[in-house]
Structures are given as structure tokens and as C-alpha cells.
Amino acid sequence: MRIISRQIVLLFSGFWGLAMGAFPSSVQIGGLFIRNTDQEYTAFRLAIFLHNTSPNASEAPFNLVPHVDNIETANSFAVTNAFCSQYSRGVFAIFGLYDKRSVHTLTSFCSALHISLITPSFPTEGESQFVLQLRPSLRGALLSLLDHYEWNCFVFLYDTDRGYSILQAIMEKAGQNGWHVSAICVENFNDVSYRQLLEELDRRQEKKFVIDCEIERLQNILEQIVSVGKHVKGYHYIIANLGFKDISLERFIHGGANVTGFQLVDFNTPMVIKLMDRWKKLDQREYPGSETPPKYTSALTYDGVLVMAETFRSLRRQKIDISRRGNAGDCLANPAAPWGQGIDMERTLKQVRIQGLTGNVQFDHYGRRVNYTMDVFELKSTGPRKVGYWNDMDKLVLIQDVPTLGNDTAAIENRTVVVTTIMESPYVMYKKNHEMFEGNDKYEGYCVDLASEIAKHIGIKYKIAIVPDGKYGARDADTKIWNGMVGELVYGKAEIAIAPLTITLVREEVIDFSKPFMSLGISIMIKKPQKSKPGVFSFLDPLAYEIWMCIVFAYIGVSVVLFLVSRFSPYEWHTEEPEDGKEGPSDQPPNEFGIFNSLWFSLGAFMQQGCDISPRSLSGRIVGGVWWFFTLIIISSYTANLAAFLTVERMVSPIESAEDLAKQTEIAYGTLDSGSTKEFFRRSKIAVYEKMWTYMRSAEPSVFTRTTAEGVARVRKSKGKFAFLLESTMNEYIEQRKPCDTMKVGGNLDSKGYGVATPKGSSLGNAVNLAVLKLNEPGLLDKLKNKWWYDKGECGSGGGDSKDKTSALSLSNVAGVFYILVGGLGLAMLVALIEFCYKSRAEAKRMKLTFSEAIRNKARLSITGSVGENGRVLTPDCPKAVHAGTAIRQSSGLAVIASDLP
């Protein structure tokens, strides 16, 4: 039964083969793939698989059987061997890719053996009968675009990988229209060469570029353009490539440069959408390259399989017998033995017209694409956007740009904006228990609060990202690459920078800044000097040494003048006549103001204690009055200053200004290694700052620090031998943090501001700027600063421990007063002892007593107040007989009480 069934099938196949011109059920096709074409090979396999598994028998009455070889184009023998291998297998047509090294070998074999080659590679310059070019030519579209932009001076960057067809067309047009074109071959350029070239072109004010390179080299050129910051507003790039959406242009979106290009594949057509659904389901391990959308070369590969399948269907309908290709033979035979049906195959291929992924696929007599349409795209803030199209009939047709409704941030409302910042207290810090939080909740600080307020005003979602290298942003002098937060913006890794980022000219050239949210200047930080210990006689500090000397001389002078006027004025003399019935002179001295009483009067008035005597004459009272007025002013001034001098412990700073730093050598000083402060000194033309920059640049060890925290730590550990130059806001903040051992000295060296940064030309720029202005008007920015600088300060308003401790007096503040008191008491006792001994000696001589007996009598008198047997007080110095009566008036400060003596 099985044998009968097989015979029936064979018989039916034979009749079917006779009816259809003996067309084979399995069609052998070749595939030649070069390096870095994994995705194209995946598209090739997928197209064959979908054809062979098509449920429509009329669409796929035969199977395509591929024979694939991977070739190394640098080895011409390997290319020849691969082609001959395909030929010996009896393939009817070959799908293959080539480069400039293998194109001539493959096209020569195809022409000699009449084997058709369907290729998505760049179009050949000559006429190759058996080569079908799937890739359309860009010449017409590019020239139309240049005419539209009216470019007459631009740079044309090209390589020779794709030949010289576009270069030749541009140079011919330039000659006709008088264009000035700088054509530069970049085939052998490396990264450094690219950057040097771009810098040179920038010096020549070249802002317009046409780039005609294959995708790998093109991507590298674009990266170097970004690295040197030439992807910002003012630059315009036309990319001569058919896969505008295949190119990574995210960084150009943030930069703001105008980028124009061409797109062959329309991802909105039903056929492409259907294929994309199938493409996404491919196993990435089995189908390499399927993790990304198909490139235009992959779409051309897919269309190439469709062209071959349609060709074989057409041959089948025409009943052309291709079942026997003849003797495969040796492809290197001399003379060559071409395939007899090769002409039919080539003719049918060129007659094919299908709708593929790349639109209408049709060829002319030379195997080149005709009647195709390519879209023109421009890079907008929202990404690539179609602005027109080009075809052979209509040429360049531009679509009127539809204005974007809503605010500038409408395009980003549905995604999260990356906000780059730097870990710097008090701007951005980790919370104490940050491990318990995720995302933005891990951080706190001034800039964290500011970011939240800005996001509320412009209505966006954001994610805080700490800059990896911990730098603010500077441009490397050698590589021309930006680092830090500026680099994050320039190279498209972030969209907003909210940090203590200084607004400078060099930064403004590559990024945009908002209005300043904080004003500041460069200041000097030093280690806080030890507070000077108050001197023993610190109570003398309120008045200068010269004033004290003048007071002493004034005191002596006033006393002498008072003595003299009292001597010369008759009203100071008190000579009185004896009363009636009394004899002898009065006990009252003739003049009270002797030299010692004058000194005593002046001292009492100066001490504001007064005296028992006072001038009676007008001249004496004038002297006393002016002396009292003088002492009133001096004592009041002294008292007013005394409190401040006793309660404030002064610090003597070795540095008070930048000039002090520049003219000394003991104290080193430096800045952050990357930032605006260093740039300020590097560019300054002021002599003092130039001198400081010369020192900092050549100092060993280096005085530049990687972070602000490192600089502060160096100040604290240097024992006063290192000064750190940084922004005044940070200086003031650190001064308020424990251990409270740093201080700001002198004024600010310049005036500048911190701004919120966005990429050049970003749609966020205007919205962020308005948000900062709105926050500033009600004083919210000042409120935020007070919150993080002073409300959370740890050193008090004066930078010390607290107000109470600062105003409290210690013993050292008034020790001198106690010393004077003790000294005065000691001096008084010493004088009393001298007087005691002197009087005892005089008493011994007068009373004919020994000195020791006189001492004992005086001591007994001093202790008991009596030396007599019955307790009477003996006063040997008093007169023996005194008139009885009432107490005699005081004279010369001595009062004597007279009483009846026995």
C-alpha cells in the first residue's frame, strides 16, 4: 500500500512538473554575510522562515533553501572560495553584503558566471548587469535638502567605504553654484584626530556639517562631537544615512543642535507593524540582534528575500525551466562557463515590483532602485520627527510644522527627568536612616528641597542622580571633554543640574543656566585661631596705653596746679585772730591744700569717691570743676568699653585678606581641583590673583583637593598652615558646624551666583528659570538658606558654644583687680609696719627706753588700746596742757578730742 501511494505521489509530481515547466519545489539560494551583520542575518532567516511557513500555498508553492557563508572581506581568497562554494551548490541567486574590499571580487564573478547578486550594501559606481541594489541612492535627496537650507559654506565629512558617488555629486553642485565645501576624508581618524579636527573647524567658525559615513564610523563621529561640546545650539548636521532612527541621538536632544537626516523605513505602515510584532517575539539567543528594532539594512535584507521569492514565483508563472542550472562546474574555469538561465533570472529580478518594509521596491535596467520615497527627519526636543519626504517625482516636500500645544514641558510629563547633583553639605546629604528609604527620599538638603519646589512649579517627575565622579564640571585642556555635572548635561546623561553650580562663561557656552538662586563669592577659610587669654591687667584694655599715660600726667598736673593756685589765692588761707580772753595762735593750719592733700583731692575725684576737703577759692574750684568734668567723660568711656573687653575673647587671625595670603609663604592655600574657583584664578588678570595662581599651580604637594570635604579636612589638620579658597556660602555653612574650628576671613574675592543648569536649548530651560523667579519673589529661597545654614547650625550665632558662655566672666578677666587689691593691702600693711617701727624708735629715744621696750609698749597699745596700769591711754605726742572745751575743728585731716586730764 505504501509503495502504491509513493508511486501515485511521484506520478502526480511528474505531471505537475511538466505542467509548470519542471519548476523545483526547493529553490537553492545563497547568502554571503560579512562582519558585524548579525541583525541582517537574523532578518534573512526570518524572511525565509515566514515564506516557507506561509499558509497560502499560492504565495509559497516552493521552499527557499539557503546556503550561507560568512566571509572575511580582508581576505580576497576567502571571498573567492565562499562565492565558488555557493556556485558549486547550484544556487539560483545570491543574497550578499560587501564592503569596498570585496565589492569588485563579487561583482566580477557575478558578471562572468551570470549569477545575480541582490545586495543591501552601498550602490556601486559603475554598471554591473547582474547586481541589484536594494539601497536607494541619496544623491538627489541630499542635494535637494542642501538647496532648501541654502547652504553655500559647509564641511563634508566622508569615508571611502561607500565610494565617492555622493562626494562627486556635491563637488559638481558646488562648482555650479559657487559653494565653499571643505571635504575631509576621515577614514583613518581616531578619537584624538576627530577632536583635533573638530576644534580646528570650530576655530574657523564652521557650524554646518554633512556626514557621509557608515553607521559604525558615523556613531563614533557623533560621540566625538558630543565630547567636544559641538552638539549645542548654533550647529547643524545633515546625516547622509537612510536610518535616522537607527542612530543614537539622545545627547543631541539635550544639546540643542539641529540634526537632519533621512529615514527609509516607515514604522507606521501595517506591514512594518506586523513584522515588528513578530520581531519582538524572537529568541535573542537564537536570533542575535533581535533585541533592538531592525535597522534599515535589516529591512533591506528582508525585502531582498521577498524580491527573490517574487522572482521565483514570476519564473514559475512564466514556466521558465530553471530546474537544471547546468553543470555547476568550476567557477574559476577558463574560459568561464556562465549559467544559461542567468539572463532570464537577471531580467525577471529587475522586473519585480513589490511593497516591502522599505516601501515600493522596483529596479531600473541597471538594477538600481527607482520610484522610492524616503522621509526627511529632524531632531526635536521630543526626539526624531518627520518634517517631509523626498521622491524622484515630487523631489523634496516639506510638511508644515504643527505647533506644539501646551507648555514647554508637555513632552516630558509622562517620563521621569534625571536631576544630577553632588553630595555636598548642606545642599545634598544622606538622611541619617537613608537605608530605610528609596529614591529621592534618601536625600535631604537645600538642593533637595529646591528640586522639589521646582518640580511642583513645572509639573514634572524627577529622579535625583549623584554625579559619579563627584565633580562640578570643568573641561579637560587636552581631551576637551567635560567632566562632573556639566558633562552629565552636555553628554545627555541628565536633564537638570540642581546643585551649587556656579554660573560661568565657559559653562554658559555649552549649557543653559537659570537666574541665580543664590549669590556668593570666593572666600578664604582658615583654621580658627586659639582665643587669646585675657591678660592680668586686661581691665586696662578699654583705654589705650597712651591714654593711661596722659591720665597719669593729667592727674599730677592737676594736683600741682591745685597746689599752686591754693598757695597764691588768698581765699585758701585760714589765718584767724585769737578770740577775746584767749591767748596763743589757732590750731587751724593756714592752708589745707598742701601738695599731699592736693594729690589726695585729685585721686578722690578721679575715683569718684570725693574728699573731706574742697577748694574755697574761685580758682581752686575752677581747677576742681574741670577735673571733675574730665574724670566724668573718661570714666564713662572706660565703663562703656569695659564690658565688651571683659566679655569678648579676641582672636588674632594671621590672614585677613587675599593680599595677606599672596605676600607670605608659611601658609599654603588651594582650591577644588575642578570647579569655577580654580577657573577664576586661572583666568584672572589681577596681579594678586595671578601671583596666587602661579603659586597654586606649582606647589608641591598639590594644593588642589578633589572635594570640598577634603579641603576642609586639610584646613582642620594643618594647624593653621593651610587656607582653603571656596564659595562663601559653603564657608559660612562649615563655620556653623562642629567642631566649630574654621572661620571665614576677609571679604569675597568676586561676586557670582549659583544657577539651575539645563542642556543647551532644552525645553526645560525656560520653565526652570520661571520657577526660580517665582520661588525668589516670596522669599522662599532665603527661607531655605536660613533653614539649612543657621536654624540647623551647631555653633551658635557667634560661632562659639553659646551666648551664655560667651558673656560670662571668668576669674582671668578680672584677676588684675584682685592683684591690685591684694597688693594695696600688702603695701598698706608694710607702710604701717614701717610707721610702727619708726615711731617706736622715736619713742625709745624720747622716753629713754630701749627699742624693744618701746616696741612692746606700742604693740600693747595697738592690741589693747592702753599701756597704763589702770587702763588709761597714754598719748605722749599730745601736749601736756590743752584748753578744755568742745572738740576742736578738723584740720589737715586730723581730729583731736580734748578732755580734762587728771
UniProtKB/Swiss-Prot annotation:
Q: How does it sit in the membrane?
A: Multi-pass membrane protein
On the tree of life, the source organism's domain of life is Eukaryota
Q: Which GO terms describe its cellular component?
A: AMPA glutamate receptor complex; dendrite; kainate selective glutamate receptor complex; plasma membrane; postsynaptic membrane
Q: Which Pfam families match?
A: ANF_receptor, Lig_chan, Lig_chan-Glu_bd
- Name the keywords, alphabetized: Cell membrane, Cell projection, Disulfide bond, Glycoprotein, Ion channel, Ion transport, Ligand-gated ion channel, Lipoprotein, Membrane, Palmitate, Phosphoprotein, Postsynaptic cell membrane, Receptor, Signal, Synapse, Transmembrane, Transmembrane helix, Transport
Which residues are involved in binding L-glutamate?
Answer: 500, 502, 507, 676-677, 727
By its UniProt entry, which SUPFAM superfamilies does this protein fall under? Periplasmic binding protein-like I, Periplasmic binding protein-like II, Voltage-gated potassium channels
Covalently lipidated residues (S-palmitoyl cysteine) read 611, 837
Write out the catalysed reaction: Ca(2+)(in) = Ca(2+)(out); Na(+)(in) = Na(+)(out); Mg(2+)(in) = Mg(2+)(out)
- Residue ranges annotated as transmembrane are 545-565, 618-638, 814-834
The positions flagged as glycosylation sites are: 52, 56, 258, 371, 407, 414
The answer on whether this UniProt entry bears the keyword Lipid biosynthesis reads no
Which residues are recorded with the post-translational modification Phosphoserine? Answer: 862
Which family would the database say this protein is a member of?
Belongs to the glutamate-gated ion channel (TC 1.A.10.1) family. GRIA4 subfamily.
- Extra remark beyond the main annotation: The postsynaptic actions of L-glutamate are mediated by a variety of receptors that are named according to their selective agonists. This receptor binds AMPA (quisqualate) > L-glutamate > kainate.
The entry describes its oligomerization and partners as: Homotetramer or heterotetramer of pore-forming glutamate receptor subunits. Tetramers may be formed by the dimerization of dimers. Interacts with EPB41L1 via its C-terminus. Isoform 3 interacts with PICK1. Found in a complex with GRIA1, GRIA2, GRIA3, CNIH2, CNIH3, CACNG2, CACNG3, CACNG4, CACNG5, CACNG7 and CACNG8. Interacts with CACNG5 and PRKCG. Found in a complex with GRIA1, GRIA2, GRIA3, DLG4, CACNG8 and CNIH2.
The record's domain comment reads: The M4 transmembrane segment mediates tetramerization and is required for cell surface expression.
Q: What is this protein called?
A: Glutamate receptor 4
Q: Which organism is it from?
A: Macaca fascicularis
